[in-house]
Amino acid sequence: MVMRPLWSLLLWEALLPITVTGAQVLSKVGGSVLLVAARPPGFQVREAIWRSLWPSEELLATFFRGSLETLYHSRFLGRAQLHSNLSLELGPLESGDSGNFSVLMVDTRGQPWTQTLQLKVYDAVPRPVVQVFIAVERDAQPSKTCQVFLSCWAPNISEITYSWRRETTMDFGMEPHSLFTDGQVLSISLGPGDRDVAYSCIVSNPVSWDLATVTPWDSCHHEAAPGKASYKDVLLVVVPVSLLLMLVTLFSAWHWCPCSGKKKKDVHADRVGPETENPLVQDLP
């Protein structure tokens, strides 16, 4: 019978002073993670219990009288493995597996030890998409400088960062004014000597990264083929989204302002107007 030792372990945690340690563990969707049950030197475990504390409190695994058990009804059923060192392995991980976990252990002398861990599960970063926008005058010569905007975008991913790298130079550094929209857009000026220079957009989060590389000089043709992006298209990239939000806010304020009563009055007047005009129309010969 396993219920009695489980209740005794929970009573240990509730009634006795215990040592609590914390750590953060990072992993990605589709992978696995090992939650290590760390304990002091010489701590010989007699009983142990792994639980999920947040977003829901669930029993995940237990160790009692030398027996390991993980067949508990939880969101990790079939995805949890308790190792002989009492570390808990979870996988394959899903996007909703982030949360707080705890392991409560009691040694052979009856002394408890609790460890809490925070698991954060991230989506793997996909390969980004880089678009090239050119800003050149139509009468410019092919040998002249070409102003280029590089736009980088990774779909359906949160908590990511963007960075750029010039592939032909190890110590390439971007000036602050050449980056826009949190690093997603890079403005560069190219000359004839930059024909073979490639730029890479690197997208990363705490557990993964990917990149896409382009050679922007290939787009610096002053007789652009149909479908090529011009400098006007850059506005679609660099204009802040806050402008749209501002318009929505102004529209909402106008829609709910007190002047709506005046509109109702005007509508009522419009309805009455034709009725007062009808008798005049009927008196005409």
Curated annotation (Swiss-Prot):
Keyword Disulfide bond belongs to the record: yes
Swiss-Prot/TrEMBL GO biological process terms: B-1 B cell lineage commitment; defense response to bacterium; immune response; leukocyte chemotaxis involved in inflammatory response; negative regulation of dendritic cell chemotaxis; negative regulation of macrophage chemotaxis; negative regulation of monocyte chemotaxis; negative regulation of neutrophil migration
SUPFAM superfamilies listed in its UniProt record: Immunoglobulin
Keywords for the protein's UniProt record, in alphabetical order: Disulfide bond, Glycoprotein, Immunoglobulin domain, Membrane, Signal, Transmembrane, Transmembrane helix
Annotated tissue distribution: Expressed in lymph node, spleen, thymus and bone marrow.
Segments traversing the membrane: 234-254
One Gene Ontology molecular-function label: signaling receptor activity
Signal peptide (from-to): 1-22
Start and end residues of each stretch annotated as Disordered: 262-285
Gene Ontology cellular-component terms listed: cell surface; membrane
Domain Ig-like C2-type: 128-215
Its job: May play a role in B-lineage commitment and/or modulation of signaling through the B-cell receptor.
Protein's UniProt name: SLAM family member 8
Organism expressing this protein natively: Homo sapiens
